């Protein structure tokens, strides 16, 4: 229910296409963080990392507006929700806090990129360059982690 209201606001800020890109890319980055930094004997599933990514994008958007009353109010609200959710994530053993943090960090980058940066043509393509960079870093991390795991004597079949 919380994501429905928060997600609707974020979609209104960035539009449907960018919102979908933020959700999918940050979900991928969150899963990557879980895989790269998690123990070998665990498997993370769920959409909470992508939801944290949307939170991160909302925060990035409002960080640029922190000198306005509305921007500061939005940052306080989002910050409180994130803090509460992170306390829960770290406190409950079955919650994958690595995915939550990975999604949040990716969301901050995605939100900054989705709004655009630079001038002229660069600004026009900036959202997609930023999303592509997140995916590229995630893929590099997956390849690196998989290579490390394959080198372990317990996993010769990977």
Per-segment meaning from a language model:
Residues 67-90:
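Membrane-embedded catalytic cores of phosphoryl/pyrophosphoryl-handling enzymes
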Residues 86-158:
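C-terminal transmembrane module of polytopic alpha-helical membrane proteins
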Residues 12-13, 61-75, 115-128:
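Alpha-helical transmembrane bundle and helix-membrane interface signal
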Residues 1-61, 65, 97, 102:
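Transmembrane helix-loop-helix
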């Amino acid at each position: 229910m919380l994501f429905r209201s928060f997600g609707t606001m974020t979609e209104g800020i960035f539009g449907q296409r960018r919102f979908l890109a933020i959700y999918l890319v940050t979900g991928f980055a969150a899963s990557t963080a879980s895989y790269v930094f998690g123990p070998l004997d665990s498997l993370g599933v769920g959409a909470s990392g992508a939801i944290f990514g949307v939170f991160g994008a909302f925060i990035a958007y409002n960080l640029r507006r922190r000198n306005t009353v509305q921007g500061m109010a939005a940052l306080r609200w989002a910050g409180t929700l994130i803090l509460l959710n992170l306390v829960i994530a770290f406190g409950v053993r079955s919650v994958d806090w690595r995915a939550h943090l990975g999604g949040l960090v990716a969301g901050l980058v995605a939100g900054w990129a989705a709004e655009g940066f630079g001038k002229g043509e660069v600004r026009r393509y900036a959202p997609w360059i930023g999303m592509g960079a997140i995916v590229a870093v995630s893929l590099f991390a997956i390849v690196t982690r998989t290579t490390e795991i394959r080198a372990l004597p317990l996993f010769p079949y990977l």
